[in-house]
Amino acid sequence: MTHYHFVGIKGSGMSSLAQIMHDLGHEVQGSDIENYVFTEVALRNKGIKILPFDANNIKEDMVVIQGNAFASSHEEIVRAHQLKLDVVSYNDFLGQIIDQYTSVAVTGAHGKTSTTGLLSHVMNGDKKTSFLIGDGTGMGLPESDYFAFEACEYRRHFLSYKPDYAIMTNIDFDHPDYFKDINDVFDAFQEMAHNVKKGIIAWGDDEHLRKIEADVPIYYYGFKESDDIYAQNIQITDKGTAFDVYVDGEFYDHFLSPQYGDHTVLNALAVIAISYLEKLDVTNIKEALETFGGVKRRFNETTIANQVIVDDYAHHPREISATIETARKKYPHKEVVAVFQPHTFSRTQAFLNEFAESLSKADRVFLCEIFGSIRENTGALTIQDLIDKIEGASLINEDSINVLEQFDNAVILFMGAGDIQKLQNAYLDKLGMKNAF
């Protein structure tokens, strides 16, 4: 039995990958910071040991998986090289695993995690599917036919993968600390397209995805009859969103998603396209779609009296707009209150005006101090720069959290990729619901 040690095991992808290797029968442990991170819950539930960083964690006969946030100068990586152990980066190791399956990569600036979660759930309704989701969830099912996984474009990590299929949800400028501009992002996706072995499923309304060239067929999905697979007759019901699906202009079937918002229909179309191409049983696919419960930190709801408190990972202007749209469609008679924590100074600086525009779609806006990262913990701007651009916006922290109680009939959206859950939990504690998230 191989013994794997994950350096940075609480990272969302690393946590998922560690769980997969554990499920497949390997001995797994890892190390990370001692501060609480939500991904550790799933690790502890599976009995996977989490250690504080220490060179003495590294033993003979281990394979060491190196998280992308950690340099080769990290004490555990140094010790591994001293012991002449195999040290493999996260993305290279994942690239080796997927070659054993019919693999489906889900990539794009936005919607990766939600789509991967939906894909894994729906495909498991018909065929065994192992999966790696960017919310820290992973499962390795013995004798799986398929492997669904999230493929991140950051630092071109997804170029380590050669999947059978790729779902490309969109191309957008993000990660301004790495990508120079939208053309740089496009070039990365174009290179990724040449790694795909069977087919690409891409959103038809994305002007950049329409320019992608590949050595395999590209199937576009959307709401237009010119798309290869499209949805029509969309109806919002108390059970979710119902819609008809057409493939190559011919009626395919009627589907019901328990979610709300145009972006959730698009995610479903991408998943349905994969199931269609792989000739999965449509009855099983429909049933699985109707039972999808979502993924962690993507519009996760808690209802207290007339308030709906939502935990969401949205940290880019387009994601914020989509989250607000979902709230308005699902709760049309409630006020929408946005509580947002910007993630990284470089992203806040690059999208300052766009953040202001998207957040202004809420009825009220509260902002937290900017959350830094391992690579970047200071910047040339402050949260006041964003507050000044949004009418009626104000600063919020744990000491002033009680201001949210005044919104009696509202959806309270806690959004961000940092530690905004501390603020959520402070509010829930005040309301008498401890540790809901």
UniProtKB/Swiss-Prot annotation:
Q: Is Cell division one of the keywords UniProt gives this record?
A: yes
Gene Ontology CC: cytoplasm
- The record's top EC class is ligase
Pathway the protein acts in:
Cell wall biogenesis; peptidoglycan biosynthesis
Record flagged with keyword Zinc = no
Keywords, sorted A to Z: ATP-binding, Cell cycle, Cell division, Cell shape, Cell wall biogenesis/degradation, Cytoplasm, Ligase, Nucleotide-binding, Peptidoglycan synthesis
Give a GO biological-process term. cell wall organization
The entry's ATP-binding residues are: 108-114
Where, per UniProt, does this protein localize?
Cytoplasm
* Catalytic reaction list: UDP-N-acetyl-alpha-D-muramate + L-alanine + ATP = UDP-N-acetyl-alpha-D-muramoyl-L-alanine + ADP + phosphate + H(+)
Q: Which terms in the Gene Ontology molecular function aspect does this entry carry? A: ATP binding; UDP-N-acetylmuramate-L-alanine ligase activity
Q: Which Pfam families match?
A: Mur_ligase, Mur_ligase_C, Mur_ligase_M
Q: What is its EC number?
A: 6.3.2.8
Which cysteine pairs are covalently linked by disulfides here?
A: none
Which domain of life does this protein belong to? Bacteria
Which InterPro entries does this UniProt record tie to the protein?
A: Mur-like_cat_sf, Mur_ligase_C, Mur_ligase_C_dom_sf, Mur_ligase_cen, Mur_ligase_N, MurCDEF_pg_biosynth, UDP-N-AcMur_Ala_ligase_MurC
State the family named in the UniProt similarity comment for this chain. Answer: Belongs to the MurCDEF family.
**HAMAP family according to UniProt:** MurC
Q: What does this protein do?
A: Cell wall formation.
Which NCBIfam families has this protein been placed in? murC
Full protein name: UDP-N-acetylmuramate--L-alanine ligase
Organism listed in the record = Staphylococcus aureus (strain MRSA252)
> Quick one: which gene encodes this?
murC
